[in-house]
Structures are given as C-alpha cells and as structure tokens.
Amino acid sequence: MAHKKGAGSTKNGRDSNSKRLGVKVYGDQPVKKGGIIIRQRGLTFKPGINVAVGRDYTLFALQEGDVKFETIADRKFVSVIK
C-alpha cells in the first residue's frame, strides 16, 4: 500500500480573455464615420439615427457627428447628430 496519496489533477486553472465590451464613445462626444460607439452582446442599446448594427451587435456611426443617448419607452437608443 502506498504511504502517500497520488497527485491528482484539477479541473480548475482556466480563464477566458476579456472581450473589452462596453461604451467606447460617450454622449456629446464626436465620432467619425465608421467609428465604433458600443461593443455589446445582444441589442442592449438599439441603433438610432445614423447608427448601424454589426453582426456581433456592435453599434457604429454611419456618418460624422456627436453621439446622443436617449431612452424611449424603456428602450435605449444611440444616435449620431451632426
């Protein structure tokens, strides 16, 4: 019989890389055409005027202007105003 317990393996010791999600350009700040405004998982923020959605739900500017956040009927919208 062994006098010491054999070394076991662990199921821990892993972690995923952070995805750097969140707001990249805040309200009343300027943004260029194609500039990323928000990186998100799902449509937490919806696109407003002059804003489009990427395939990973990233919101980006369709033209140059200032970012504007607004809430309409409990929905958050992001727009770009010239």
Curated annotation (Swiss-Prot):
Keywords: Chloroplast, Plastid, Ribonucleoprotein, Ribosomal protein. One of its GO terms (molecular function) is structural constituent of ribosome. It comes from the Eukaryota. Coiled coil: none annotated. One of its GO terms (biological process) is translation. It holds the Pfam family Ribosomal_L27. GO terms for cellular component: chloroplast; ribonucleoprotein complex; ribosome. It is found in: Plastid, Chloroplast. Residues 1-22 are annotated as: Disordered. Its main location: plastid. PANTHER family: LARGE RIBOSOMAL SUBUNIT PROTEIN BL27M (PTHR15893:SF0), RIBOSOMAL PROTEIN L27 (PTHR15893). Belongs to the bacterial ribosomal protein bL27 family. This is Large ribosomal subunit protein bL27c. The gene is rpl27.
